[in-house]
Amino acid sequence: MMRSPLSHLAVAATLVCIAATPMESGSLSLRDGSRLWFDGTSTIRAWRCTADKIDATLHSPDSAVIANTLEGKKVAGTVQVDFPVATLECKNGTMNEHMAKALKATAFTTIRFTMHSYEFTKGSAVSGTLHGTLQLSGKTLPISVPVTFGAAADGGLRVTGKVPVQMTDWDVKPPTLMMGTIRVGPVVTVNFDLQLQQGRAVAAQ
C-alpha cells in the first residue's frame, strides 16, 4: 500500500540524483541525512512510512554535473534506483506487515526507478521534471517527478520534491485493517530531501 508511493518517491528522489551525477568517475553518493518518506491517509488517521535504504547507480560522462545542474544546464546521464521493500518502516508492526503484503514483497522484493530523460523549468529557482519508469509490485509504468535543485554544503547538491502516487495504477490494493473497518487511502505522496556529492556510489541509509 503505502510502499507503492514510497517507491515512487524513492524513484523521484533518485532521478534527482541523476542531475547530480559525479564527475569523471561517473558515480554519485548520497550523504547521511538524505531522507525519503511517504505520507498517506486512512479512515481514522494520517500515516507516514520512511525508507531506510536506497541503492542508486548513477553514471554521467560530464565532469561538472553538480555545477552545471545548479546553473540550469542539462548534462547527459543515466540513473537507476533500487529500493528494498523490506526496508520500509511505518513505526507500526501491523502496518509494516500489511504494506509488505500489499506490495507482494515476497515475490517482488525490490522497487526500481529508471530515469530516461529530464527537463528544466524556467524560473527563479532551478527546478525540473524527471521522466522514467517505476517498477513496483511486478508492474512497470511511466512516471514523471517534479524536483527542485539547490546547493548543499561542501559543494554538494540538494534535491527535493514530492509526487502523488495512485497505488491502484500499479495493481496495489490499499490495505484494510480491523476486518475492513480501517481503510487506507489509494493515493500516497512520496517526499524526498536528498543531499548528494560526487564520489563513489553507495547505498544511502
Where are these regions (language model features)?
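Bacterial N-terminal signal peptides that target proteins for export
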Residues: 1-10
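Bacterial Sec-dependent signal peptides at the C-terminal "C-region" and cleavage site
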Residues: 11-13, 17-27
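Low-complexity, acidic/polar, glycine-enriched regions of mature
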Residues: 22-205
